[in-house]
């Protein structure tokens, strides 16, 4: 994105310092270090604001406090900004999740996602098969007025979340 939109500025936040170091190196190799900034931070303590778009890329379900993270994101948006929420594809009911991809996601969620969330503050434990209805509830609790499905793939749902 930084290469395609050189007049824009991109920030990346992650609590894992080693991942931030790799991102910085890759930005340098791609020649986009001037319009990218990578900072070690949790989703609730970065101080930058005024964003047009904030993306949560397959991570909200792993967070102990996804409502708090989304609320912090809402406050960091400029007026009219939005959150792009990318999460594992899931139906809102169990019957809709009986397929090979969901089986894999349930297994990964049981072994990785849910324990990760439970080990953190709040420990909401959404898991990798939360579904659009539950994700929309989280975003509403965080102060978003609308959450609409912008796109989907066999593996992900992509939601556009707008502040109330």
State each model region's role.
Residues 67-79:
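A short glycine-rich, Lys/Arg-flanked "PGG" loop and its adjoining helix->strand segment in the class I
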Residues 41-54:
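A short acidic, Gly/Pro-enriched loop at the edge of an enzyme's catalytic core
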Residues 140-164:
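Core SAM-dependent methyltransferase catalytic element
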Residues 32, 63-64, 77-78:
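Helix-to-beta-strand junctions that scaffold the AdoMet/dcAdoMet cofactor pocket
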Residues 52-67:
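A short SAM/SAH-binding and catalytic strip from SAM-dependent methyltransferases
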Residues 86-142, 148:
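C-terminal alpha-helical "lid/dimerization" subdomain adjacent to the S-adenosyl-L-methionine
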Residues 1-44:
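Class I SAM-dependent methyltransferase SAM/SAH-binding core
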């Amino acid at each position: 994105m930084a290469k395609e939109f050189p007049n824009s500025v991109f920030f990346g936040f992650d609590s894992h310092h080693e991942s931030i170091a790799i991102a910085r190196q890759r930005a340098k190799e791609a020649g986009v270090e001037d319009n990218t900034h990578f900072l070690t931070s949790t989703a609730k303590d970065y101080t930058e604001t005024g964003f047009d778009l904030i993306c949560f890329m397959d991570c909200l379900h792993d967070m102990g406090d996804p409502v708090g993270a989304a609320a912090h994101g809402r406050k960091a948006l400029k007026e009219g900004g939005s959150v792009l929420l990318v999460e594992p594809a899931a139906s809102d009911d169990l019957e809709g999740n009986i397929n090979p991809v969901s089986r894999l996601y349930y297994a990964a969620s049981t072994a990785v996602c849910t324990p990760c969330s439970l080990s953190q503050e709040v420990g909401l434990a959404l898991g990798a098969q939360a579904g659009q209805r539950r994700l929309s509830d989280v975003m509403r609790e965080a102060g978003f007025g609308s959450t609409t499905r912008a796109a989907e793939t066999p593996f992900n749902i992509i939601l556009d979340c707008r502040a109330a």
